[in-house]
Amino acid sequence: MSQDFDYDLVIIGAGVGGHGAALHAVKCGLKTAIIEAKDMGGTCVNRGCIPSKALLAASGRVREMSDQDHLQQLGIQINGVTFTREAIAAHANDLVSKIQSDLTNSLTRLKVDTIRGWGKVSGPQEVTVIGDNETRILKAKEIMLCPGSVPFVPPGIEIDHKTVFTSDEAVKLETLPQWIAIIGSGYIGLEFSDVYTALGCEVTMIEALPDLMPGFDPEIAKIAERVLIKSRDIETYTGVFATKIKAGSPVEIELTDAKTKEVIDTLEVDACLVATGRIPATKNLGLETVGVETDRRGFIEVNDQMQVIKDGKPVPHLWAVGDATGKMMLAHAASGQGVVAVENICGRKTEVDYRAIPAAAFTHPEISYVGLTEAQAKELGEKEGFVVSTAKTYFKGNSKALAEKETDGIAKVVYRQDTGELLGAHIIGIHASDLIQEAAQAIADRKSVRELAFHVHAHPTLSEVLDEAYKRAV
């Protein structure tokens, strides 16, 4: 490192993306600092992935042990199940503390300098850190922006963080309302509906688009609606906006038809979770000091090497990863982007393969996917001149699923008819989040279903649902 610089790399934001980048940078021999103004670990560790999975694990056990029909099929009888909200909430909070501590310690152990305060770009290769007691200026050969995202709250919604709240508050599980409305049917809304119904709450789900779960493959969404929504007596509204939400007791929700814009109903519920997506936290980053502007939604434009783009060209020595780029708002995607950015900083040209990054909803049963949906693949096929085919298998034909008495589910693979290249995989079923990685690796390696059909899977395992899907594709 030149004496003109304090660090080879300064990272703004110690979420999963920044943390992953910092660890890889140190392994590559870069003197690295990471700046964080709030909680180490960012959204994932403190208000997202980690606490929500703890809640899902606990509530999932309650659901499983409360399902007398399922238990009797296995020859098990339990005389009632009890739980305490406070203990489940404490489990989530304790896990957050542990992961946050582990993350911080890993940075210290590898000699990454952790600097507390608000970090912002103050010029080319320069970062200003505004702390409680001092302001520092750091010179860095490379700067990486990892500011993350925050929940999006549409206009007309009054948030009081008690009766009307976002996922930031929901993960604390401070109350179990008798009746809760959830605005949005994406993975956040789905996961919290899973938690709340398992713990005895009545749920109403409101979706602005015509169909529930619009981000999932339609066949998967149809099964999910049957298994995760209808079987749990969740009331649903589709094609409807929650145009006004007034916090209080009760919470008042005005519903408006998305097409006609007419008010169609008013709900009075005990609480409301607003799960309408997330927006980038890109304000006050000092981007203007290097002539960079965010797009109209606030995202930082980057290329697949994670270089910040201005007027179609990379900005020297400036990188961005994670939710703030708008590419794929997932913690593991951010971590992968961070590693790719560091590789490029070190002169090893690398690009992010977004098609091979999997995603999952940790409902009961789980949903996972990687690559293209059937519709997306067909659209690509029309452009590039190839035909798309699909193959499906059902968990009800899988020996391990039958042994578990967990037979709701399907695995669907999407592939090119000419070359057999796997383009996408979509699963709903027990342990779907674990099963999808096999397909993700196959997509990353551009494998053909004709090759995959000859791979031997252990028997009896759930992984055979993909094995059977590959074989049906040949």
Swiss-Prot record:
Enzyme class: oxidoreductase
GO biological process: 2-oxoglutarate metabolic process; pyruvate metabolic process
Substrates-to-products reaction catalysed: N(6)-[(R)-dihydrolipoyl]-L-lysyl-[protein] + NAD(+) = N(6)-[(R)-lipoyl]-L-lysyl-[protein] + NADH + H(+)
Swiss-Prot/TrEMBL cofactor(s): FAD
Binding site for NAD(+): G184, S185, G186, Y187, I188, E207, A275, T276, G277, R278
Gene Ontology MF terms in the entry: dihydrolipoyl dehydrogenase (NADH) activity; flavin adenine dinucleotide binding
Note from the entry: The active site is a redox-active disulfide bond.
Record-stated family: Belongs to the class-I pyridine nucleotide-disulfide oxidoreductase family.
Protein name: Dihydrolipoyl dehydrogenase
Species name: Synechocystis sp. (strain ATCC 27184 / PCC 6803 / Kazusa)
